[in-house]
Amino acid sequence: MIQPQTYLNVADNSGARKLMCIQILGASNRKYAHIGDIIIAVVKEAIPNMPLKKSEVVRAVVVRTCKELKRKNGTIIQFDDNAAVIINQEGNPKGTRVFGPVARELRESNFTKIVSLAPEVL
């Protein structure tokens, strides 16, 4: 469950390291974002000499959450950190690599490009 003011790790090589969520896209009164949801975030920490700079506002899709996710078959999946992948306006990732595992629910949310770049899909 990601809410405004939540810090997330960046799971790609776009140049940012940490993001802070400032808004969840969808309904106007939405309080939480889960895996596969698009958020608007601000870059809080960035790698030097990269395209993304600190205090830049970006769109990102949540790929991992600490809050457990219950699937229809009864299994529960939980990650060690909150992480997101930065995307452009069309929904394609800005980076060329994705680090760490991602959830299978991203495929149902039409983020197949992120799923194909990920080293492991859980």
Swiss-Prot record:
Cellular component terms (Gene Ontology): chloroplast; cytosolic large ribosomal subunit
Keywords in alphabetical order: Chloroplast, Plastid, Ribonucleoprotein, Ribosomal protein, RNA-binding, rRNA-binding
GO MF annotation terms: large ribosomal subunit rRNA binding; structural constituent of ribosome
Organism superkingdom: Eukaryota
UniProt main location, coarse: plastid
PROSITE patterns listed in its UniProt record: RIBOSOMAL_L14
Localization terms from the record: Plastid, Chloroplast
InterPro entries attached to this UniProt entry: Ribosomal_uL14, Ribosomal_uL14_bac-type, Ribosomal_uL14_CS, Ribosomal_uL14_sf
Pfam family, one: Ribosomal_L14
Gene Ontology process terms (BP): translation
Gene3D superfamilies associated with the record: Ribosomal protein L14
CDD domains membership: Ribosomal_uL14
Family that this chain belongs to: Belongs to the universal ribosomal protein uL14 family.
Subunit structure and binding partners: Part of the 50S ribosomal subunit.
Classification via PANTHER family: 50S/60S RIBOSOMAL PROTEIN L14/L23 (PTHR11761), LARGE RIBOSOMAL SUBUNIT PROTEIN UL14M (PTHR11761:SF3)
Biological role stated in the UniProt entry: Binds to 23S rRNA.
Name of the protein in question: Large ribosomal subunit protein uL14c
Lineage: Eukaryota, Viridiplantae, Streptophyta, Embryophyta, Bryophyta
Gene name of the record: rpl14
